[in-house]
Amino acid sequence: PHALGGPGFVGDDAAPVPGGDLVAACDAIVPSMVERDPEWAGWCSVLVNLNDLAAMGAAPVGLLDALAAPGAAHAARVLDGLARAARAYGVPVLGGHTQLGVPAALSVTALGRAARPVPGGGGRPGHAVRLTADLGGGWRAGYRGRQWDSTTSRRTDELRAMLGAVAAGRPAAAKDVSMAGIAGTLGMLAEAGGCAAVLDVAAVPRPAAASMGDWLTCFPGFAMLTADQPGASAPPAGPAVSAVCGELTTGRGVSLRWPDGEVTEAVGGPVTGLGTA
């Protein structure tokens, strides 16, 4: 169990390090993406780890990367994307490890600081669900309907403002939207809190270029799902758009409430199988 997070943080986006305010996150990029789109893989390795820290309310300190590549040219393309993202976010790459002559693979560890990390499992029935998302940008070329790219066009101050949203708002629970999409990530947040969730489809902030079906299931670049007492203020989040769009309820899974009042099942049960945090 200790490999999955400490008490109260099981399955969380990042792990508080005992004895201080250090928070660590580690994510790997799908190898096929590292192979066919190395610059984007490098950028995303920074993006997803900083999003993980942000979901805990942690301010980033630095990054470590572990890269494997078939050759030096391929490795350079991955590292170029990684370095560009690190500069864009204003977060240093502290070091890492590179191995050549092997299949492509990439993993990044991010370190941050948070005196009081925000858990993913702090939501309870009756809490309002809020989505804070960057609706700028568009579909990444080659990933239409699957990966939305808003971050590569943002300034450093905009990126850092979005990363600070959870720390500023301090909700009861927070999760950054991952490859599971909005629906799947909300399922993770609800599962960690031992409850279910209902999402009001019409209230979900969404870019005009994305269908609702794609938006609820894609990787949206920057998006945070939070749960808190009804009436809690929207956090300052730079260019991101924020709206209450659902609530946590008793039970399990995620339901979608459509504008005509019909309710359909989006997630039938546990997403991770880790249970309550």
Q: Whereabouts are the PLM-identified features?
A:
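Glycine-rich anion-binding loops of enzyme active sites
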Residues: L22-V23, I29-P31, A59-A141, E247
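Acidic, Ser/Thr/Pro-rich beta/coil linker or hinge segments at domain junctions
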Residues: G238-A277
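Short, compositionally biased
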Residues: W139-E158
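Helix N-cap motif at beta-to-alpha junctions
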Residues: A227-S233
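Extreme N-terminal cap/leader segments of soluble proteins
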Residues: P1-V34, M56, D65, A83-L94, ...
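General beta-strand structural signal in soluble alpha/beta enzymes
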Residues: G6-V10, V23-A25, P92-G96, A110, ...
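Small-aliphatic-rich amphipathic alpha-helix that forms the alpha element of a beta-alpha
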Residues: D37-L63, R77-A88, E158-V166, I182-M188
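Active-site-proximal betaalpha loop/short-helix elements
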Residues: R155-G221
